[in-house]
Design a protein with these regions (language model features):
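Conserved substrate/cofactor phosphate-moiety recognition/catalytic segment
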Residues: 195-235
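Hydrophobic positions on the alpha1 helix immediately C-terminal to the Walker A/P-loop
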Residues: 189, 193
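The conserved Walker
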Residues: 182
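Nucleotidyltransferase catalytic core that binds NTPs
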Residues: 1-174
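Short, structured active-site "lid" loops
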Residues: 50-70, 219-246
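ATP-dependent NMP and nucleoside kinases share a basic, alpha-helical "lid"
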Residues: 105-107, 127-131, 253-275
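Hydrophobic anchor at the beta1->P-loop junction of P-loop NTPases
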Residues: 178
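Conserved glycine(s) of the Walker
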Residues: 185
Length: 275
């Protein structure tokens, strides 16, 4: 069985990576996507980015797994390279650690005959042959098919938004929430702004809940309903985030729901506070 290996940090995963992994799956029987991380190096890279939210190593692993979850011949795992010296000096230690991790998954692996590295990085071919004895298939090393790389995205995420898979967009999307009093025109304003900026929006779920579950008025609203309202609102927010164009517009936040709960029920709600 031919084994393919794709290695990257994927900060963040973009469609150039997706293309690389997808094409790798057509060259071999099984692909392992190695999501490498280094605590110090990753922290510096992310802190110097324009992301509004941290991307952890497990976030990156989830992006890969979610993107390829329907393809059984693509597997992925985290690989800690924190203790490896910088490349190229670190190649020897790095390769021995990766061999050990791979052989946990594929015992008695014949690195010379059974393994193919798939990469878009220059010089990988030389080092993979030297330290693994394995060949390398280079795909789009000049970034001609997808003219973007991760550092450009980190510098300006909105400029390269179209190159991000949905899983990554949902994680990184800026959320703009508009709050105000009841029946003050928030919903219509959100709708107009979403049209102008060609993006998605989420209306206040509380009003929808009252109509669907309480017969159209709040007379029967009680303490247990507030949790259902915030969960429904969260579902709407996640949908808007997943389908947004660079940012999502949201009508009302969770603090407003908590304020209504405190006012009308005279009780705090720790579940709402978690949001």
């Amino acid at each position: 069985m031919k084994i393919g290996i794709v290695v990257g940090r994927f900060i963040p995963l973009h469609i150039g990576h997706v293309n690389l992994i997808q094409r790798a799956s057509g060259l071999v029987d099984k692909v392992y996507v190695v999501v490498s991380y280094s605590d110090e190096g990753d922290t510096e890279m992310i802190s110097n980015s324009r992301f509004i939210k941290e991307i952890t190593a497990k976030d990156r692993l989830r992006f890969v797994k979610q993107t390829f979850k329907n393809q059984n011949n693509i597997s992925s795992f985290l690989f800690d390279e924190s203790n490896c010296p910088p490349f190229p000096e670190g190649w020897e230690k790095w390769s021995s650690l990766l061999k050990a991790e791979m052989e946990k998954r594929e015992p008695n692996l014949d690195w010379e005959n059974d393994v193919l590295f798939i990469s878009n990085r220059k010089n990988d071919e030389k080092y993979n042959l030297k330290f693994f004895g394995s060949k390398t298939k280079s795909i789009d090393p000049e970034y001609l098919e997808y003219p973007v790389n991760s550092w450009e995205i980190r510098e300006n995420p909105s400029k390269y938004w179209e190159y991000l898979p949905r899983e990554v967009r949902e994680h990184l999307i800026p959320i703009i929430t508009i709050c105000g009093g009841e029946s003050s025109g928030k919903s219509i304003m959100i709708d107009k702004l979403a049209n102008v900026f060609n993006t998605s929006s989420a209306w206040e779920y509380g009003r929808e809940y009252v109509f669907e579950k309480l017969g159209g008025d709040e007379d029967s609203l009680q303490y247990s309903d507030y949790e259902k309202i915030v969960f429904g609102h969260q579902s709407n927010v996640l949908y808007a985030a997943r389908n947004a164009n660079k940012f999502a517009l949201i009508d009302t936040d969770y603090i407003t729901t908590l304020a209504f709960c405190l006012t009308y029920e005279k009780r705090d709600n720790p579940i709402i506070r978690e949001f």
